[in-house]
Amino acid sequence: MKFVSFNINGLRARPHQLEAIVEKHQPDVIGLQETKVHDEMFPLEEVAKLGYNVFYHGQKGHYGVALLTKATPISVRRGFPDDGEEAQRRIIMAEIPSPLGNITVINGYFPQGESRDHPLKFPAKAQFYQNLQNYLETELKCDNPVLIMGDMNISPTDLDIGIGEENRKRWLRTGKCSFLPEEREWMSRLLKWGLVDTFRQANPQTMDKFSWFDYRSKGFVDNRGLRIDLLLASAPLAERCAETGIDYDIRSMEKPSDHAPVWATFRV
């Protein structure tokens, strides 16, 4: 089974990239983040014609996530159990049947956080990671097939930082988000629960592959970016991971998202 995660940075602005992903990868499951479209305005017909069951959880102008599945899910959940009406639309989950049993897929657009001293955004990022941790610990078991994918807005290791050493030090010094010690600790807790970073498992030393590139500084041209889009798998999936990758070809299309799609294939 093949899973693709893509921060599309506006679904209605980039249908050409979604179509290209489907044509090239033929994924079983696609997780989209930052769809930026209210549920009532979601282009359901246009997306469904690509051959998928389509589930979405969005709001006007910001955030928003969607799951596209070949197989009909057993169940779909939008948001965390305790989310109120005011909660940002950032997470969607599904139980997807497979020969391995039902796979719990969690697709998230994790808060960016901005910087350590931001009074709202940084605590919101911490809370989101805590909510996910709580969900894993209370609702799921790590010996079952679980896949968390999405724009997680954290570079797990220094190998995932490609913005230059001076910028790396400056970001740490000024408290800018993406690889602060606190953020690394949140990520570490997820991994300790029983998840594996599929890309890093397959590429333990790779230090020149990234998934986000800044528009303004034309980071993609120079391969200056961060690997912040991840597929984290529990052991039953991780040990069956056949291939992973980051699709630079899709990122190099006309009018692209600032993110590249990331993907993993599992032998199930």
Curated annotation (Swiss-Prot):
PROSITE patterns cross-referenced by the UniProt entry: AP_NUCLEASE_F1_1 (PS00726), AP_NUCLEASE_F1_2 (PS00727), AP_NUCLEASE_F1_3 (PS00728), AP_NUCLEASE_F1_4 (PS51435)
Binding locations of Mg(2+) 1: E34, D258
Recorded name of the encoding gene: xthA
Site feature (Important for catalytic activity) residues: D229
Cofactor field: Mg(2+); Mn(2+)
Residue pairs linked by disulfide bridges in the UniProt entry: none
Cofactor note: Probably binds two magnesium or manganese ions per subunit.
Single GO molecular function: endonuclease activity
Subunit (UniProt): Monomer.
Known catalytic reactions: Exonucleolytic cleavage in the 3'- to 5'-direction to yield nucleoside 5'-phosphates
Protein name as catalogued: Exodeoxyribonuclease III
InterPro entries: AP_endonuc_1 (IPR004808), AP_endonuclease_F1_BS (IPR020847), AP_endonuclease_F1_CS (IPR020848), Endo/exonu/phosph_ase_sf (IPR036691), Endo/exonuclease/phosphatase (IPR005135), ExoIII-like (IPR037493)
UniProt organism field: Salmonella typhimurium (strain LT2 / SGSC1412 / ATCC 700720)
Annotated catalytic residues: Y109, D151
Binding site for Mg(2+) 2: D151, N153
Record-linked CDD domains: ExoIII-like_AP-endo
Keywords assigned: DNA damage, DNA repair, Exonuclease, Hydrolase, Magnesium, Metal-binding, Nuclease
Signal sequence range: none
